[in-house]
């Protein structure tokens, strides 16, 4: 029990962050109050501004302060003919960092999960359907997570693409660079064998 209701309230609200339990939240609160009050004020200001001004791109649904994000506004990207479907906005920077993709994106904000009441409409597949109908795509790359839900979501979207005669592909899953076979789980190794490629000399 804290001596200050305000401190208790701060600790409780810090727990909304992923991976932050009671002890971590308490350490954060004490650190801000004891050593970095100016940092705490800056954090509060940044949070308030971000929560009030950041919305979703009307095309790809990623986070942006404008109606359309920088990637969707890029003419080179618009004419690429490639669309990459991801589960979360945080997946976009990860793919961009590789430098291997120069097309556009569509963010699902989750994956299909009927048991949790998450169907096609809840992850924006009606909006994706409209994009497939009205925009010209050569290929749709499915970059959902390698989970049961992610695979089910990818299969559902693949069927949508087939209806529009659009080429569809799935990102490869397999052994990480620098990894050793004996430490790799069976499912990952299985995907690696299925997704093997021929060596060209």
Swiss-Prot record:
Cited CDD domains: TOPRIM_recR
Give the UniProt keywords, A-Z: DNA damage, DNA recombination, DNA repair, Metal-binding, Zinc, Zinc-finger
Q: Where is the signal peptide?
A: none
Acetylation is among the record's keywords: no
InterPro entries in the cross-refs:
DNA_Rcmb_RecR (IPR000093), Rcmb_RecR (IPR023627), Rcmb_RecR_Znf (IPR015967), TOPRIM_dom (IPR006171), TOPRIM_RecR (IPR034137)
Specify one Pfam family.
Answer: Toprim_4
| Entry's Gene Ontology BP terms | DNA recombination; DNA repair
Location of the Toprim domain: 81-176
Start-end of C4-type zinc fingers: 57-72
Q: Which GO terms describe its molecular function?
A: DNA binding; zinc ion binding
Checking HAMAP family in the record gives: RecR
NCBIfam families hit by this protein: recR
**Belongs to which family?**
Belongs to the RecR family.
Q: What does this protein do?
A: May play a role in DNA repair. It seems to be involved in an RecBC-independent recombinational process of DNA repair. It may act with RecF and RecO.
UniProt-recorded name of the protein: Recombination protein RecR
Q: Which organism is it from?
A: Histophilus somni (strain 2336) (Haemophilus somnus)
Whichever gene encodes this chain, its name is: recR
């Amino acid at each position: 029990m804290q001596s200050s209701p305000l401190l208790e309230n701060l600790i409780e609200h810090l727990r909304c962050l992923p991976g932050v339990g009671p002890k971590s939240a308490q350490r954060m609160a004490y650190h801000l109050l004891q050593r970095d009050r100016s940092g705490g004020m800056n954090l509060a200001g940044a949070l308030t501004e971000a929560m009030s001004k950041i919305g979703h791109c009307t095309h790809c649904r990623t986070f942006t302060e404008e109606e359309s994000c920088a990637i969707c506004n890029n003419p080179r990207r618009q004419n690429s003919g490639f669309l990459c479907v991801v589960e979360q906005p945080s997946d976009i920077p990860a793919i961009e960092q590789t430098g291997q993709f120069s097309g556009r994106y569509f963010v699902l904000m989750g994956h299909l999960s009927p048991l949790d009441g998450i169907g096609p409409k809840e992850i924006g597949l009606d909006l994706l359907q409209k994009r497939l109908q009205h925009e010209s795509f050569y290929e749709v790359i499915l970059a959902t997570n390698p989970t049961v839900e992610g695979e089910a979501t990818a299969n559902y979207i693949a069927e949508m693409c087939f209806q529009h005669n659009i080429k569809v592909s799935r990102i490869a899953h397999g052994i990480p660079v620098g990894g050793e076979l004996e430490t790799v789980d069976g499912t990952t190794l299985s995907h690696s064998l299925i997704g093997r490629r021929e060596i060209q000399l």
